[in-house]
Structure formats: structure tokens, C-alpha cells
């Protein structure tokens, strides 16, 4: 599986940071 750091989510094999 494609994994991202904590607080990030994966989409299309890229990581995006969750902005609050």
C-alpha cells in the first residue's frame, strides 16, 4: 500500500497534508 506520514492522506500516489 502507498502510505503517507501521520496527518497526511494519500490520493493518486501523492501525499496531501490535512489543513485545518
Curated annotation (Swiss-Prot):
What's the name of the protein?
Snaclec ophioluxin subunit alpha
Cellular component per GO, a single term: extracellular region
**C-type lectin domain ranges (all copies):** 11-20
Subcellular location per the Swiss-Prot or TrEMBL entry: Secreted
Q: Which UniProt keywords apply?
A: Disulfide bond, Hemostasis impairing toxin, Platelet aggregation activating toxin, Secreted, Toxin
Where does the entry say this protein is expressed, by tissue? Expressed by the venom gland.
Signal sequence bounds: none
Q: Give the protein's function.
A: Binds to the platelet and collagen receptor glycoprotein VI (GP6) and activates platelet aggregation.
Other notes on this protein? Negative results: does not agglutinate fixed platelets.
The record's comment on protein family reads: Belongs to the snaclec family.
Disulfide feature: 4-15
Record's subunit section = Heterodimer of subunits alpha and beta; disulfide-linked.
GO MF terms listed in the record are: toxin activity
Amino acid at each position: 500500500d502507498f502510505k503517507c506520514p501521520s496527518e497526511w492522506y494519500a490520493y493518486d500516489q501523492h501525499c496531501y497534508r490535512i489543513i485545518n
